[in-house]
Amino acid sequence: MINLEWKELDQLEIEEKVQEVLDYSYNTWMSDKKNIRYFVRAFYIRWDMIAYMYGMEENETEDDKLKSMFDFGISELRNITEVEWIMGYCMLINPIFFEENDNYLELEEKGKEMLHNVAINNPDDVFLTSFGIPEKDYLKWKRANREQLIQYGEDNFSYDSEFSRYFKHIINCRADEEVEKESFLKKIVRRWKQR
């Protein structure tokens, strides 16, 4: 996986400038649409914000931007590991954010398929591989790869941002005990509410 640290965006996050984070990430991505770092981080920040706001208030502008990025990612960046990973992950967790014509279950399956493809195509990446381990084999695999997963989190997600904290937490859950994703999203919602 490429380095996804984005210092300018991370600084805005540290300063808790939510609207600036949203605007800066999207506008920078729009100026260089094939930049993978910009795409992954701008896509994630929108997904995260919408997950946080889900059920509280609608933000059609950000919803539309996320769907526009989704369409672009599918049509222009689909075979790029980091894009397929972030889109597959977000679709698996919240397919409702991407649905049209009530195709919720289809999108959830597509997210699983994308993550499975990423796992198969990246056998040397312990984190990405973890998304392709069958459930019945996962506990044994997790125990055998615990140290590698923890090191992966340190190597790839040790910068100061919501993105980094979120995925480092996910990696630690994969290394230790599996935690319900919904409960972590509730934590994210609490953080965003405090802003």
Describe each model-derived feature in a short phrase:
Residues S130-R195:
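Long, ordered, amphipathic alpha-helical scaffolds
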Residues N103-N122:
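Short secondary-structure subsegments characteristic of cysteine-rich extracellular domains
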